[in-house]
A protein has these predicted regions:
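S-adenosyl-L-methionine
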Residues: 1-94, 185-209
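Glycine-rich adenosyl-binding loop in Rossmann-like folds that engage adenosine-containing cofactors
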Residues: 4-36, 94, 99-140
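Adenylate-forming
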Residues: 41, 45, 108-111, 158
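Active-site segment flanking the S-adenosylmethionine/decSAM binding pocket
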Residues: 49-62, 127-128, 132-184
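Hydrophobic packing residues within well-ordered alpha-helices of enzyme cores
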Residues: 66, 86, 112, 157-161
């Protein structure tokens, strides 16, 4: 498996199913309507976040678009190929830190599937070599915004972050139906967020802020 640099400078997996489209059009994050609306909201409200945590960073496209509105961003990406792209894409930014691991509702090690032709990486609940941690175990107490894009593993991330979420102001989460792999529906996740006191600010499928 290999990675390549697009004409606009972004490093991406050369095996990705959408690579031809990105070669022609550039940054893939521009396809994200919810993100674009949130960026407009941040600009309009002159919003600046002290600390943002990006869970499931992929190659860093979301982080690159948000870094202008954040003093610090911590990125978590367990897939080694995607992490290699991430490290190259954000390496010049002093306010961005990267971690090659997964987040969930357990502390230990898990196995990942290898879906190199997509942006998807599945976490298998069995022993492996990829580190996984609860967000609550990492000592955060001042996160302003969390973005979660973990291909169905959202509820596990949320359950492992119950204490941390008490002080979080905003969550952007992708709900594309893959959560049923792990026993949770989109409705379950929405109800869980509602029970924690969160209200919808922006909703453009498949993402919610």
């Amino acid at each position: 498996m290999s990675i390549e640099q697009l004409s606009d400078g972004l490093w991406v997996p050369s095996t990705d199913a959408q690579i031809e489209q990105w070669r022609e059009k550039g940054y893939p994050y521009m396809q994200d309507n919810c993100l674009n609306k949130f960026l407009e909201w941040c600009k309009e409200h002159e919003q600046k976040f002290d600390l943002v945590v990006d869970v499931g960073t992929w190659c860093g496209t979301w982080t690159l678009s948000m870094q202008q509105y954040a003093k610090n961003i911590h990125c978590y990406e367990p897939n080694n190929l995607h992490y290699g792209c991430l490290a190259r894409n954000v390496g010049s930014y002093e306010n961005i830190e990267t971690y090659n691991q997964a987040l969930g509702n357990d502390d230990g090690f898990v196995k990942l599937t290898d879906e190199s032709a997509t942006q998807n990486t599945r976490v298998l609940i069995e022993k492996g070599q990829t580190k996984i941690s609860k967000l609550d175990s990492l000592g955060y107490n001042n996160i302003d915004l969390i973005k979660i894009d973990v291909e169905g593993f959202e509820m596990e991330v949320l359950k492992g972050a119950e204490k941390t979420l008490e002080n979080v102001q905003y969550i952007m989460i992708e709900l594309n139906g893959n959560s049923e792999r792990y026993g949770s529906s989109k409705r379950d996740i929405k109800e869980h967020l509602k029970s924690l006191g969160f209200k919808v600010l922006i909703k453009t499928w498949p993402d919610i802020v």
